[in-house]
Amino acid sequence: MASKLETLKANLEAAFGGLLQSTTEAIGELTIVVKAGDYLNVATRLRDDRSLGFEQCVDLCGVDYQTYADGAYDGPRFAAVLHLLSVQNNWRLRLRVFAPDDEVPILPSVVEIWNSVNWYEREAFDLYGIVFEGHPDLRRILTDYGFIGHPFRKDFPVSGYVEMRYDPEEKRVVYQPVTIEPREITPRVIREDRYGGLKH
């Protein structure tokens, strides 16, 4: 008798065949990778095909692979990863799709397929700059309206570009260039024979 994962894998291969770039198993779940051009077609069939039945998308997140594998990775930089759930079949699936352009990452929106991804796509846009074409309201959701850049990108500076403070003279919040100075952190070495009551 085939396991649930083997059954799911066989159903995926029967439904998609050559559309799947890869199928891997990790942590008791399958991950499939598809091209951006096939993304909408695959997502629709994942939901509508009764042998798959992924009626829920429980999460969508952006990923920046710029420094993946200590810089040895040379594939596309940005991806969206969806976590899908089939209640009727009691199985889960990860769907990964890479944006073909690293400079302006664009992927189709799947809001029309799973409306739960609305705010997830907005979050991935806000934090990674992934543009979801066809999204009904793609605007920032976590950062401030005038925020510059996308803070979860690997090349975004830790201190940011601007800081916000209240100006008592102007009686309003103002933005200014970051005034935090870069620091070198030097480890503190304690050279005491009996530090903390311990014998050495």
From Swiss-Prot:
Pfam families: Complex1_30kDa. GO terms for cellular component: plasma membrane. The keyword Cell membrane applies. PROSITE patterns: COMPLEX1_30K. GO terms for molecular function: NADH dehydrogenase (ubiquinone) activity; NADH:ubiquinone reductase (non-electrogenic) activity; quinone binding. It is found in: Cell inner membrane. Belongs to the complex I 30 kDa subunit family. This is NADH-quinone oxidoreductase subunit C. It comes from Paraburkholderia xenovorans (strain LB400). The gene is nuoC.
